[in-house]
């Protein structure tokens, strides 16, 4: 079932906006669009006068100056005096509050349109002039009650601006939701990248450990050539260790992990050591499988040394790792090498 969130009468869907204009704005840029750009993107037709005046009336609480150009837009034509007479009569008859500012009022500086009108006036005219000021709420009453020839067009445009604000709010909410999802995905990607890097570091450390162990064992093998001849004796010549934890094991593991460069891994050591290593390896490779396990091998190191001496092209040995595409052949070789311990060739 689709989840919806309601905010100030707007229903926000998990599937995204249903309004084509909001979709267009969201698809225009990953950056947040200011209202002017939003209007351009969705193709909103702006009136050079009404857009600016009406927008400020809707979004802020600052009083507005009923400038000459605004009065003309509202439908009050003729000379300045005629305009003033008509608008004042309209305001009084409809009980709409307004105020007047004279040239010596310090609040004059708050209205750039008044300062602009004063530039084209003579000093004596400025001294006698009164400028009409109206609060946003009262100006909305003007729009609703306007009875000039432009009244219907003014109200229609005001309604369109209200619809624009609703669209912009919807766009803003979906934009913030998209930003939150992007940040969430970035965080998840960052976490996954770190986890992947950590796994790679573990695999690399494992590889280096194996290579080092391999070198140590090769040196040890060179020092114990004679001992090897004795270690390959049959089990009745090399009795089993009674304590199970101290018994030697030779184990071949299949990692079953696509991340690993080598799928097969050899472990040699006492039983308790092997069990501990397998437990930790399963945490690193959840699909780990034991494919070859010899318990009580008299000297498991020698078995792997003999395997490497075969130099079989089907197998590539890197440390304790084995690369091969033929697991069956690998098992056959180890079984044969294990059986060969019965063939004693003492010098």
Swiss-Prot record:
Pfam families, A to Z: DUF3627 (PF12299), MSV199 (PF10553)
The keyword Coiled coil appears for this protein: yes
Keywords: Coiled coil
InterPro entries noted in UniProt: DUF3627, MSV199_dom
Coiled-coil parts of chain: 178-226
Homology family: Belongs to the IIV-6 006L/238R/313L/468L family.
Name the UniProt record assigns to this protein: Putative MSV199 domain-containing protein 388R
Upper classification of the organism: Viruses, Varidnaviria, Bamfordvirae, Nucleocytoviricota, Megaviricetes
């Amino acid at each position: 079932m689709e989840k919806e969130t309601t905010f100030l009468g707007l229903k926000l869907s998990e599937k995204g906006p249903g309004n084509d204009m909001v979709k267009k704005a969201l698809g225009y840029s990953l950056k947040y669009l200011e209202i002017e750009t939003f209007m351009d993107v969705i193709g909103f037709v702006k009136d050079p006068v009404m857009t600016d005046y009406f927008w400020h009336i809707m979004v802020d609480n600052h009083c507005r100056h009923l400038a000459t150009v605004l009065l003309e837009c509202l439908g009050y034509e003729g000379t300045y005096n005629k305009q003033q007479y008509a608008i004042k009569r309209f305001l009084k008859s409809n009980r709409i509050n307004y105020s007047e500012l004279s040239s010596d009022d310090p609040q004059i500086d708050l209205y750039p349109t008044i300062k602009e009108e004063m530039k084209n006036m003579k000093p004596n005219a400025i001294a006698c002039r009164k400028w009409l000021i109206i609060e946003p709420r009262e100006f909305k009453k003007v729009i609703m009650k306007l009875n000039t020839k432009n009244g219907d067009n003014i109200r229609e445009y005001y309604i369109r601006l209200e619809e624009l604000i609703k669209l912009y709010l919807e766009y803003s909410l979906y934009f913030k939701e998209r930003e939150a999802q992007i940040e969430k995905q970035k965080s998840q990607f960052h976490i996954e990248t770190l986890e992947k890097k950590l796994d790679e570091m573990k695999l690399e450390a494992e590889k280096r450990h194996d290579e080092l162990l391999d070198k140590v064992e090769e040196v040890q093998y060179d020092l114990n050539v004679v001992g090897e001849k004795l270690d390959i004796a049959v089990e009745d010549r090399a009795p089993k260790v009674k304590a199970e934890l101290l018994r030697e094991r030779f184990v071949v593991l299949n990692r079953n992990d696509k991340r690993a460069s080598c799928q097969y891994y050899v472990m040699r050591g006492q039983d308790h050591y092997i069990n501990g290593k397998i437990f930790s390896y399963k945490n690193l490779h959840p699909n780990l499988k034991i494919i070859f396990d010899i318990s009580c091998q008299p000297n498991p190191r020698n078995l792997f040394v003999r395997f490497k001496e075969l130099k079989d092209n089907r197998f590539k040995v890197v440390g304790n790792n084995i690369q091969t595409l033929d697991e069956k052949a690998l098992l056959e070789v180890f079984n044969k090498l294990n059986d060969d311990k019965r063939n004693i060739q003492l010098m």
